C-alpha cells in the first residue's frame, strides 16, 4: 500500500509540476509573441526603394561592363525579392511578384555571358516587367525607367 501511495504521490507531483511548467511556457510564449509583434518589420515600400536603387546601379554597372558589380547588384535585387516574400506575406501584391523571376534570370544570364547587347535587352524587359507588376497591383502611378544618371555620386561604375 505504501508503494502504491508513493507512486500516486509521485504522479500527482509530476502532474502538478507539469502544469506549472506549461503555464510558465505559455506565459513566456505570450511574452515573446508580444515582443515579436512590436519588432521592426520592413514595409514593402522600403524593399521597393532598395530595389529601385539597385536597379539603377545595375544599369550603370552593365553599361560600363563592370560585370562583377552587375552580378552583385542583380543578386541584391534577388535577395530583396526573397525578403519581400518572407516579410510581407500579408500584402496582396506578393501574388504578382513571381512575374519578375524570368526577367531577373535573363539579366543574370546576360551578366554571366558578359554580353552588353543581351544585358540591354534583358534590362529593358526587367524594367517593363516592373511596370507591368505595378499596373497589375494598382500601383501604375509608379513608373520605373532606365536611369539617366547614377543613383549615387560617390561610386564609380567603371571597371577599376
Can you annotate each of these PLM segments?
Residues 1-7:
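Sec-dependent signal peptide recognition
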Residues 14-15:
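C-terminal motif of bacterial Sec signal peptides marking the signal peptidase cleavage site
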Residues 20-67, 159:
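Immediate post-signal-peptide N-terminus of mature secreted/exported proteins
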Residues 67, 93-96, 100, 104-126:
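Amphipathic, charged alpha-helical scaffolds that flank and support histidine-based chemistry
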Residues 80-97:
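Short, solvent-exposed, charged loop/turn and helix-capping segments
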Residues 126-138:
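The canonical Cys-X-X-Cys-His
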Residues 144-154:
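Short cysteine/histidine-rich metal-coordination sites, predominantly Zn2+-binding motifs
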